[in-house]
């Protein structure tokens, strides 16, 4: 049995199958640290976690880390929970307010702004979500995670970033991947792999363990929008994102 393992996982609906699997895998005794994606990466960097689900954009900067498992948080087409929302068509957007809970999504919107939408907006940090209720002409908001569900239908224009990436590159997208500290035993790697497999194979049961069970969209989202398999095409997509997407970083105006 793999014991005393500290695992940082994302506290969003998209990670519920992973969390369920980790909690129910008999050969894995782990301490779970749940947080938004950016904090999962920080927990790994600070040595608080041995294994972590981290934004794909940060992996090249992690020291002493290696990619593990055949699983990820990915999408083939629309992901639904990483969306640029606006009452202005994207070609006329002047300001983009960024949700910094995931470095990957921030990098991705920067890549799409330059290469797909051909715009050069002012980039601003979104800390006050009441700004969404006071949107001005030319404003757009990058929203990430479960909060997107609360704002669906509020804006006239919604640009799903995974869908926009696929139109641009003809590839799926990888938002988050599993990493581990180099040197962890085979038993740990195997136990984590088995745990994630169990969770992905029991999505319905995983939802019953959570408040999301009563939400009609939850099962559809996890089975139709999120693609958990880190397959060959997603490896290709991740390499392309690392080669090109990371070169375009939105320069945020501090205000």
Regions flagged by a language model, labelled:
Residues 12-14, 36-38, 48-60, 71, ...:
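Beta->alpha turn/N-cap motifs
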Residues 148, 208-255:
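An extracytoplasmic/periplasmic, membrane-proximal ligand-sensing/linker region
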Residues 21, 81-90, 95, 173-187:
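A bilobed periplasmic-binding-protein/Venus flytrap-type ligand-binding module shared by bacterial periplasmic
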Residues 2-11, 30-33, 94-97:
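Short, well-ordered beta-strand elements
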Residues 125-208:
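Pocket-lining segment of extracytoplasmic ligand-binding domains
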Residues 103-127, 179-225, 229:
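Ligand-binding clefts/hinges and TM-proximal coupling segments of bilobed small-molecule sensing domains
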Residues 71-130, 165-166:
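A conserved helix-loop-strand patch within extracytoplasmic ligand-binding domains
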Residues 31-42, 120-137:
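Short helix-initiation/N-cap motifs at beta->coil->alpha
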């Amino acid at each position: 049995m793999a014991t005393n393992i500290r695992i940082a996982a994302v506290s969003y609906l998209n990670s519920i199958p992973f969390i369920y699997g980790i909690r129910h895998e008999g050969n894995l005794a782990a301490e779970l640290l749940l947080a938004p994606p950016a904090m999962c990466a920080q927990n790994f960097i600070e040595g608080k976690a041995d294994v972590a689900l981290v934004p794909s954009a940060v992996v090249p900067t992690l020291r002493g880390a290696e990619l593990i498992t055949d699983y990820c948080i990915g999408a083939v087409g629309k992901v639904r929970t990483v969306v640029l929302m606006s009452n202005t068509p994207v070609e006329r957007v002047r300001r983009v307010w960024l949700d910094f809970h995931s470095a990957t999504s921030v990098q991705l919107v920067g890549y799409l702004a330059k290469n797909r939408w051909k715009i050069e907006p002012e980039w601003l940090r979104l800390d006050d979500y009441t700004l969404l209720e006071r949107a001005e002409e030319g404003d757009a908001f990058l929203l990430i995670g479960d909060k997107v569900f609360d704002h669906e239908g509020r804006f006239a224009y919604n640009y799903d970033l995974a869908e926009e990436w696929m139109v641009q590159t003809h590839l799926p997208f990888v938002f988050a991947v599993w990493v581990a500290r180099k040197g962890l035993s085979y038993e740990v790697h195997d136990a984590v792999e088995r745990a994630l497999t169990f969770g992905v194979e029991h999505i319905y049961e995983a939802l019953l363990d959570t408040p999301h069970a009563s939400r009609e969209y939850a099962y559809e989202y996890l089975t139709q929008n999120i693609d958990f398999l880190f397959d060959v095409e997603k490896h290709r997509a991740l390499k392309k994102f690392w080669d090109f997407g990371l070169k375009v970083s939105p320069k945020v105006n501090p205000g």
